[in-house]
């Protein structure tokens, strides 16, 4: 992604998270030229959005709607949400795995709209804008304690350190030191609170400094509002600063010996709250990280020793205990503790005793030094002095650590720009709020004021710069609350507090009462309420009640001169470094109070932030229990209100919920317009602005829903953006469907091509094994037996299992189960046949049986009806090894016997139309050892051990099946014994069918070549023929329309037949103009017979039906179309009679002037003859010879059932299917005669053999 450029000669563009590209050519302020648009790609890893990722896109703007959206996203582990350029973060209280290096890299160089909301997106935007626009940046992180501010600050530092580049060793060292400041400052500045286990108890503004190349060259840290009161006291279940527990638990033995370090339970300052451990925090490991961070920033061992010396001194100072002496004054109970403190601070123990128990006071008169008094302290005052010394040491030690870090992070090159990260603990409301909460909340009020001013100002500036009309939104400006606290005139809370401290400085109780009196002057302020012992300030985050007690003492925030003199007398140079100020005994001016320091720090911070371009992160804590998946709706709703998220959304949505630069808008949505895209490529040649207009026009977005600025598109409502995004998603969906359709079509094409190749190959070679079996049958007979004509058909195949006994399911399985055929036996042959059955006292007769040959047995299976149920059983089972011979005749009959020679059973005499095939399979099963006896008779054992002979005679009277009578078989003449099967007939031509449909692939295939099928007749590709009318005699060149008949009275009609004289006739009217020639009608044909289609490309017709002729083929088939259903198919020409269109009647000439009387026509004359109905023409004698087609006529004599459907031809060469016999009729209709002549012509060029079926 290229860097953006600033507008030439113009003001800076508004920048936030998103990257804005300025116009490349600035003339009238609008973009010119074709934008550089990246090709759109489908986001394959894009997750389905949960709720809305930008709160400005909410349909309903309310605190509850914001809360519901945040809750929904939180429950789906989406903790980040935008409000325009503001990031809202909800603390998950667990590791979601979203800060890995891979995630970090996914945000490098990305616009915020290209990636989901994330703190890395804020860091990327800040770094990008600093590097591209040379503007200082700052990231303001706000929220209450435990909301995740510190974590967000660390992640920003992590991202910037990763992407800022720089291979120089000094730059890498700066990065390491910047990252090392986190564990160091967290140890000294963070603590466990009730709401957060790692709560920052100070404010930090980290300023990262960069050179012109965007490489870090230094950093600077400014700290604010350290909660030093935590050093001396904590409430139950809270802890002191982390460093005290790290040091007492994991200090090396050297420090334990030097500084007397013991466990945290031994010190008052670490044991008062009875909380020593924190879940999820290893103090020992954290101590090692702290020491390592000290080493990284370059802290020497001597400096580290002094730091830990001061920590030890603070811990031992807390163990100093006081008791009342006889005078009621404070007395130290354990002098050894004081002695050890003096050893640590390198001061005199007597001075420590005096500083803790005696206060030196000085009186002054008229500006002159007065008397000096030593005033003993009571135990309460002594404890206060003790705690004040501990707090002062730790406060100054923390400042020294920050300064030491800054000295190590000092810039090592020229500073061009900076990025500031403000991490300050947020708004606090406790049951009891004091001076610390007032200062914290005051600083947060100042930050909120900056946020409102800069956010609103940025919106107003952008609308003005883009020349957009908008309506200002009312919002709460908290400037009045800031003035209530910080103003001097009229005096605010801080001014009243300082005045009370100056007026009654000696007595803290009197000072507090004075402060309460001063607050009465603020009662007229609508944001303030004064109550007994406390006052209420109406902050932007809610009303907070502050307790007055002790507030003046905390505001004084100064050490007694006795304590300053004590540390000033130290022999340790490091102590002097912590307390560099020399005590001026003559200085009578009031030192600055804590409120003065807070006010000055806050104003300096505001001034620093106003010099930078801000980014905002608003953190939210979902619950007070630090539970990972708990979302407290009430608590979050309260935070939403005091963070002002609803007002922020309203300001951001001040008329427009979405805005984007022209080029980015076009890059995102150019797919939605056919004029700006083609096949996913950007095709618009105009400017980005015109492209954006075209997209909005083609997507039918109403003009009132958007405005075009100078460089941006402004969309009014979120629903419009949702619609655009939905259309974009739908585009990818549609493209995916197209690709899938094309791919599926291509797969179908491949499958169809493979199927056709396979079909052709199987048609060519697939039946070879069956043909080989058929040839083996010829060899087995060896010219010894006459053949039946049907056995010699070229299409005859020895398929074997005709009943399907070897199949799973169907009637074949029933036969197998009924006959008890073992599953281990292979079925070689099955067919229906007959067996000669001898009955006592009756002549033998054939009976139907089922013959099954396996690799082991021959089964003769009978089917009987028993109790109205079909019973299938094996009548006889003959092992093939027991067969001695097969006896058959030399004629064409189907009878044969299986010679077994059994002593118990006779030999079976069988009849089977597929006898030769049975012989062949049996011979193969016997490995060629079959003894086939062929003679003029058939031998078999009619009874066990008694041979009989059956004669076979040729009887010309037998034209059908063989007949058996009295041991003689009568059969007709057959084909010569030397006959062999005819060649396999060529299949009839079929209409070409395209390989694919839908125009996705050409009929010729992916290569685009012409299909070979195109040469075949295709119904859709044939031109429609035109009917040619028969010529009529004396037909005029241009036919005239018939004259319109006008009804006349009866008298007039009668008069027209009367004889008239030769008087002059009345002139006839002129004839009407000739009409246009009618369009030629399409040829039709009438069905003479019923025809039932047998193939998918044939058309069924009924006798008398009229069909339209599409094309005629010379092979006896016409392509016709059913005019009712528009279905097309092939129909036999012989079944149709073409309807000849009658010639149009010529226009009758005009009537003559005088018509002679006509002679009446006899009733029984020519007219009557013409009206006579002609005799119907005889149907054709024979259908065209078409193998494989079933005919409709009267059925032939029922053949013997062989379980095979075949087109049996009679011996006379007929089709085997009778058609109506032709009657001798001298006159045939013209259409039928023409059809018969065409058929005869077509048949003359072919051999009229019986193999073409």
From Swiss-Prot:
Species annotation: Aspergillus clavatus (strain ATCC 1007 / CBS 513.65 / DSM 816 / NCTC 3887 / NRRL 1 / QM 1276 / 107)
Record comment regarding domains: The myosin motor domain displays actin-stimulated ATPase activity and generates a mechanochemical force. The tail domain participates in molecular interactions that specify the role of the motor domain. It is composed of several tail homology (TH) domains, namely a putative phospholipid-binding myosin tail domain (also named TH1), an Ala- and Pro-rich domain (TH2), followed by an SH3 domain and a C-terminal acidic domain (TH3).
Family the UniProt entry places it in: Belongs to the TRAFAC class myosin-kinesin ATPase superfamily. Myosin family.
GO cellular component: actin cortical patch; cell cortex of cell tip; mating projection tip; medial cortex; myosin I complex; plasma membrane raft; prospore membrane
Cited InterPro entries: Fungal_myosin-I_SH3, Kinesin_motor_dom_sf, Myo1_CA, Myosin_head_motor_dom-like, Myosin_TH1, MYSc_Myo1, P-loop_NTPase, SH3-like_dom_sf
Modification after translation, per record: Phosphorylation of the TEDS site (Ser-371) is required for the polarization of the actin cytoskeleton. Phosphorylation probably activates the myosin-I ATPase activity.
Main location: cytoplasm
Domain TH1: 787-977
Positions of modified residues (Phosphoserine): 371
CDD domains: MYSc_Myo1, SH3_Myosin-I_fungi
A single BP term in Gene Ontology: actin cortical patch localization
Subcellular location: Cytoplasm, Cytoskeleton, Actin patch
Domain spans labelled Myosin motor: 50-729
Region (Actin-binding): 418-500
Residue spans crossing the bilayer: none
Comp. bias intervals (Low complexity): 1029-1055, 1156-1173, 1221-1235
Protein name, as recorded: Myosin-1
Positions contributing to ATP binding: 143-150
Disordered, as annotated region: 1-40, 959-1083, 1139-1253
MF term (GO), any: hydrolase activity
Function text: Type-I myosin implicated in the organization of the actin cytoskeleton. Required for proper actin cytoskeleton polarization. At the cell cortex, assembles in patch-like structures together with proteins from the actin-polymerizing machinery and promotes actin assembly. Functions as actin nucleation-promoting factor (NPF) for the Arp2/3 complex. Plays an important role in polarized growth, spore germination, hyphal morphogenesis, and septal wall formation.
């Amino acid at each position: 992604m290229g860097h953006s450029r600033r507008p030439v000669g113009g003001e800076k563009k508004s920048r936030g998270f998103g990257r804005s590209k300025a116009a490349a050519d600035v003339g009238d302020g609008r973009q010119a030229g074709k934008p550089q648009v990246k090709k759109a790609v489908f986001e394959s890893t894009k997750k389905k959005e949960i709720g809305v990722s930008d709160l400005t896109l909410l349909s309903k703007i309310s605190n509850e709607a914001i809360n519901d959206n945040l809750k929904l996203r939180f429950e789906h582990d989406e903790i980040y949400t935008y409000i325009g350029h503001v990031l809202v973060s909800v603390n998950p209280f667990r590791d979601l795995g979203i800060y890995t290096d891979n995630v970090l890299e996914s945000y490098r160089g990305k616009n915020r709209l290209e990636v989901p909301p994330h703190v890395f997106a804020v860091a990327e935007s800040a770094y990008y804008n600093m590097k591209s626009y040379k503007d200082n940046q700052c990231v303001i992180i706000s929220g209450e304690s435990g909301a995740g501010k510190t974590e967000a600050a660390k992640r920003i530092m992590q991202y910037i350190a990763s992407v800022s580049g720089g291979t120089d060793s000094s730059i890498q060292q700066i990065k390491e030191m910047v990252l090392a400041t986190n564990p160091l400052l967290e140890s000294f500045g963070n603590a466990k609170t009730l709401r957060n286990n790692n709560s920052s108890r100070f404010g930090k503004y980290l300023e990262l400094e960069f050179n012109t190349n965007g490489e870090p060259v230094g950093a600077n840290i400014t700290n604010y509002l350290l909660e030093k009161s935590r050093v001396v006291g904590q409430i139950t279940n809270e802890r002191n600063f982390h460093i005290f527990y790290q040091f007492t638990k994991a200090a090396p033995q050297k420090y334990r010996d030097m500084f007397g370090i013991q466990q945290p339970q031994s010190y008052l300052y670490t044991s008062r709250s009875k909380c020593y451990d924190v879940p999820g925090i290893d103090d020992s490991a954290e101590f090692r990280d702290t020491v390592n961070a000290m080493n990284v920033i370059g802290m020497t061992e001597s400096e580290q020793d002094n730091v830990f010396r001061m920590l030890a001194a603070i811990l031992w100072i807390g163990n100093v205990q006081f008791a009342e002496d006889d005078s009621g004054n404070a007395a130290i109970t354990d002098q050894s503790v004081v002695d050890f403190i003096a050893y640590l601070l390198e001061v005199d123990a007597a001075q420590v005793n005096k500083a803790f128990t005696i206060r030196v006071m000085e009186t002054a008169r008229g500006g002159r030094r007065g008397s000096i008094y030593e005033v003993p302290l009571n135990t309460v005052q002594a404890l206060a002095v003790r705690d004040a010394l501990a707090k002062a040491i730790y406060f100054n030690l923390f400042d020294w650590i920050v300064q030491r870090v800054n000295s190590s992070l000092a810039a090592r090159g020229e500073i061009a720009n900076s990025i500031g990260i403000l991490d300050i603990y947020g708004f606090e409301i406790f049951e009891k709020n004091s001076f610390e909460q007032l200062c914290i909340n005051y600083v947060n009020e100042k930050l909120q004021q900056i946020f409102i001013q800069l956010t609103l100002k940025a919106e107003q500036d952008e609308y003005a710069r883009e020349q957009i009309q908008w309506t200002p939104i009312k919002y709460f400006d908290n400037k009045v609350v800031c003035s209530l606290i910080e103003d001097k005139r009229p005096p605010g809370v801080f001014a009243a507090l300082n005045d009370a401290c100056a007026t009654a400085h000696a007595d803290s109780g009197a000072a507090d009462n004075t402060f309460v009196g001063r607050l009465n002057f603020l009662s007229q302020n609508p944001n303030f309420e004064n109550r007994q012992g406390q006052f209420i300030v109406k902050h932007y985050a809610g009303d907070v009640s502050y307790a007055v007690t002790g507030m003046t003492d905390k505001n004084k925030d100064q050490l007694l001169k006795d304590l300053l003199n004590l540390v000033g007398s130290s022999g340790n140079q490091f102590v002097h470094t912590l307390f560099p100020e020399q005590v001026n005994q003559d200085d009578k001016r009031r030192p600055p109070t804590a409120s003065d320091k807070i006010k000055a720090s806050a104003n300096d911070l505001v001034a620093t932030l106003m010099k930078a371009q801000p980014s905002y992160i608003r953190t939210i804590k979902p619950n007070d229990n630090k539970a990972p998946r708990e979302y407290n709706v009430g608590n979050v709703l309260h935070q939403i209100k005091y963070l002002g998220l609803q007002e922020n959304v309203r300001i951001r949505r001040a008329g427009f919920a979405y805005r984007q630069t022209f080029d980015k808008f076009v890059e995102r949505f150019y797919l939605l317009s056919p004029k700006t895209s083609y096949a996913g490529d950007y095709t618009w040649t105009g400017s980005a602005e015109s492209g954006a207009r075209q997209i909005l026009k083609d997507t039918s977005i109403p003009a009132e829903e958007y405005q075009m600025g100078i460089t941006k598109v402004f969309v009014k409502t979120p629903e419009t953006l949702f619609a655009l995004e939905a259309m974009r998603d739908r585009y990818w969906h549609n493209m995916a469907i197209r690709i899938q359709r094309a791919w599926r079509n291509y797969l179908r094409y491949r499958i169809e091509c493979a199927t056709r190749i396979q079909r052709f190959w199987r048609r060519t070679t697939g039946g070879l094994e069956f043909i080989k079996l058929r040839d083996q049958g010829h060899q087995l007979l060896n010219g010894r037996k006459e053949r039946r004509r049907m056995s010699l058909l070229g299409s005859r195949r020895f398929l074997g299992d005709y009943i399907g006994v070897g199949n799973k399911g169907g009637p074949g399985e029933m036969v197998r189960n009924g006959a008890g055929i073992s599953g281990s036996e292979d079925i070689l042959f099955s067919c229906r046949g007959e067996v000669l059955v001898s009955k006592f006292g009756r002549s033998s007769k054939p009976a139907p049986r089922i013959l099954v040959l396996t690799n082991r047995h021959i089964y003769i299976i009978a089917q009987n009806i028993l109790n109205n149920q079909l019973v299938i059983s094996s009548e006889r089972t003959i092992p093939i090894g027991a067969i001695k011979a097969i006896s058959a005749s030399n004629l064409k009959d189907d009878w044969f016997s299986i010679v077994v020679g059994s002593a118990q059973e006779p030999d079976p005499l069988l009849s089977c139309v597929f006898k030769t095939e049975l012989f062949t399979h049996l011979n193969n099963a016997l490995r060629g050892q079959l003894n086939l006896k062929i003679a003029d008779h058939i031998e078999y054992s009619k009874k066990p051990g008694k041979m009989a002979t059956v004669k076979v005679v040729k009887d010309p009277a037998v034209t059908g099946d063989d007949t058996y009578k009295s041991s003689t078989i009568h059969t007709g003449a057959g084909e010569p014994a030397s006959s062999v099967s005819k060649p396999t007939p060529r299949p009839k031509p079929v209409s070409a069918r395209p390989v694919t449909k839908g125009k996705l692939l050409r009929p010729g295939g992916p290569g685009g070549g012409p299909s070979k099928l195109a040469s075949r007749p295709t119904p859709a590709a044939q031109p429609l023929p035109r009917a040619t009318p028969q010529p009529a005699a004396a037909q005029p060149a241009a036919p005239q329309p018939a004259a319109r008949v006008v009804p006349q009275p009866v008298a007039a009609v009668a008069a027209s037949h009367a004889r008239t004289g030769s008087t002059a006739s009345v002139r006839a009217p002129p004839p009407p103009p000739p009409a246009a020639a009618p369009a030629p009608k399409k040829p039709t044909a009438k069905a003479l017979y019923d025809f039932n289609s047998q193939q998918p490309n044939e058309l069924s017709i009924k006798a008398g039906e009229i069909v339209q002729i599409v094309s005629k083929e010379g092979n006896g088939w016409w392509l016709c179309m059913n005019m009712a259903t528009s279905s097309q198919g092939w129909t036999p020409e012989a079944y149709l009679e073409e309807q000849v269109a009658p010639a149009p009647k010529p226009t009758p000439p005009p009537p003559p002037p005088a018509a002679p009387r006509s002679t009446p026509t006899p009733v029984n004359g020519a007219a009557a003859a013409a009206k006579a109905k002609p005799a119907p023409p005889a149907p054709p004698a024979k259908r065209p010879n078409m193998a494989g087609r079933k005919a409709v006529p009267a059925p032939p004599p029922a053949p013997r059932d062989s379980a095979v459907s075949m087109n049996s031809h009679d011996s006379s060469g007929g089709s085997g299917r009778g058609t109506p016999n032709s009657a001798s009729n001298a006159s045939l209709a013209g259409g039928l005669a023409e059809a018969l002549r065409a058929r005869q012509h077509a048949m003359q060029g072919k051999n009229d053999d019986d193999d073409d079926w």
